[in-house]
Each structure stands twice: as C-alpha cells, then as structure tokens.
Design a protein with these regions (language model features):
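Short helix- or helix-capping micro-motifs
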Residues: 151-156, 183, 202, 206, ...
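Transmembrane-lumen/periplasm boundary regions of multi-pass, lipid-linked membrane glycan transferases
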Residues: 50-53, 58-63, 92, 98, ...
Length: 318
C-alpha cells in the first residue's frame, strides 16, 4: 500500500481546476466586452488601410495553401510590397493584417455570425482576452489568487486599452505580445534547456509592429542585472579570492553574465528574426533591402503633433 500523494488529492486538483477556470473565464469576459464595445466605435483611418490589405493578404495565403498559386517574387510583390514606400501597406509587417483578413473571411463571409467590421476587429479582441489570461496566470504563480484576479480585472477595466482592443489595428495586439515575450523571457530564466518561446513570441511581436525592436533594450538591462547578481553569488559560494586584477575580474564577470542563461539570448537573437521572416512574405525575396526600407520608413516618418491636456506637443519623441 502506497502513501497518498497530497499534491494529487482530489481537493487539490479541484482547486487547480477552479483557478484555471477563473482565468479563462476572465479572458472570455474580456473578449465579449471588447466585441460589444467596438460596435459603437466608428472605423479609424488606419483601420480602413489594414482591412483592405488584410483581405488581400488572406486571399494570398488561402491561394497558396490550396495550390491556387505558388511562391514567386511577382505574386509576393503584387500582394505584400511594391516600389513605393507605402505600396500594399508594406511599411508594416503582415501578421495582424493577415489575421484581420482571415477572420473577416471566416467569421463574416463563411459563417455569417458577425458583421464585416466586427469580423475584422475580432483578432484584436481575442488578443486582449489572451493578455488578461496571461496576466492572471503570471500573477497567480507569483503572488496568489486574489492578486491574480485583481490584476486581470485592472487590465480588463483599462478604458483606453479596451478602446484600442476593439480596433483592427496593432496597438492592442503589440501590447499582448510585448507582455507575452516578457513573461516567456522571465520563465526562460529558470534554466530550462531550450526556452524557444521567448524568441518565437518576440518574432511575432516584431511581425506585429516595429516598436518591438525596443524590447531587447529593456530585457537586456534586466538580464545584465540578474546575471551580475548570479555571478556574484556564485563567486561567493566558491570563496574565490578577490586578489585578481581588475581586468581579470571584469572578464570573469562578463563570462558569467553572458553564460548565465545564454539560451535565452540565443532564442531571442535567432528565433525572433527567423519568426519575423517566416510570417512576412515581403521579406522572402531580397530580405536585407526590404528590412532596411522598413526601418528607414519609420526612422524618417513624418511627425504627428498632438494636443494633450491643453498642451501641443510638436517635437519628437513626443
């Protein structure tokens, strides 16, 4: 007769199941709330561009997987690129626009369960639900159930975020993928053998909006700090002599920091760009030139001034 496993007790299992259901229920409520709220929101200027091009992107992918056409530079350029800086909205990656188009084709044209505009906007709403679920489960792991519910509700009840999540645009999806990348990076610091999730999610964030290029700077600072702390602890545990010369100590510290969780760095550096490349057909032909054109467009983009709380902000970066 074996001793009972307390972690596998029926009560414990029911508790875990209940906590999971709470998280998924909060995500579902978020999607419903966003989908209901967006019905009273008019079409934003950018949405019209993303909807039009997203429908064409979706048709191209469907034609590809149904063998209606092959992969050629001509078909990719005609759908995703062109000689002009804004031809076929090539200045923005294709991921979310493609999802907008696929959603409209499935939910509106095929199933007929939502209006055309709602169907285009549904991927953003679903993404916001995913964000609430991710926040819930991360906080649940770190602090507990009450804190997780509070954190998820605070995200759900952000008015501006709910507004953006109801648009067929990139702002809400990129927020979700930023958080997902950070969460995957944090989990990768546990020393797992291959933290591929961080790289793939960062690649999807890049394929959503160019602002994801800033994410490694924030993660890099954090990695440097935790790596230095870990290196210092390891040195103390080994009772190493502090008599080494400063250059030797600096070199040892650099090796320790880089090697602390090096697989996370490799995941971001390799899988991130690779994922971006795979989901954006415009990069399949002449990728170096097209990436340069993509970045050049945004580094020299016209500045939009705006008024906030009675003040007119005219100078970048505001």
């Amino acid at each position: 007769m074996t001793a009972p496993d307390p972690t596998g007790a029926p009560g414990a299992r029911r508790g875990r199941t209940a906590r999971r259901l709470i998280g998924w229920a909060l995500g579902l409520v978020t999607v419903i709330a966003v989908a209901a709220n967006q019905r009273d929101v008019g079409i934003a200027r950018d949405e019209a561009v993303y909807m039009q091009n997203g429908a064409r992107y979706a048709d191209w992918w469907i034609g590809l997987v149904t063998f209606g056409h092959g992969i050629s530079e001509r078909s990719v350029t005609r759908t995703f690129g062109g000689p002009g800086a804004t031809d076929n909205n090539r200045e923005h990656p294709a991921l979310m626009k493609t999802l907008f188009g696929l959603s409209e084709r499935l939910v509106h044209r095929t199933l007929g369960v939502a209006s055309e505009v709602t169907a285009f906007r549904l991927p953003s709403a679903l993404g916001h639900g995913v964000l609430v679920v991710l926040v819930y489960f991360l906080v649940l792991e770190l602090w507990g159930l009450a804190e997780a519910i509070a954190a998820a509700l605070l995200v759900l009840l952000l008015p501006r975020a709910v507004f953006h999540a109801g648009l067929a645009c990139f702002d809400a999806p990129t927020m979700t993928l930023w958080f997902a990348t950070v969460a995957a990076y944090w989990r990768g610091l546990d020393g797992r053998r291959w933290p591929w999730q961080a790289g793939v999610l960062w690649g999807l964030a890049l394929a959503t909006k160019h602002t994801a290029l800033l994410l490694p700077f924030a993660l890099g600072v954090h990695y440097l700090i935790v790596g230095l702390v870990a290196a210092r602890r390891a040195r103390r545990a080994r009772s190493e002599s502090t008599g080494a010369t400063p250059p030797r100590r600096a070199l040892a510290a650099a090796r320790a920091v880089i090697g602390y969780r090096w697989r996370v760095i490799v995941s971001l550096a390799v899988l991130g760009p690779l994922t971006l490349y795979l989901v954006w057909p415009w990069l399949w032909f002449d990728p170096v030139h097209h990436v340069q054109a993509w970045l050049a467009f945004h580094t020299s983009h016209v500045h939009y001034n705006y008024e906030y709380l009675g003040r007119n902000w005219n100078a970048p970066p505001f």
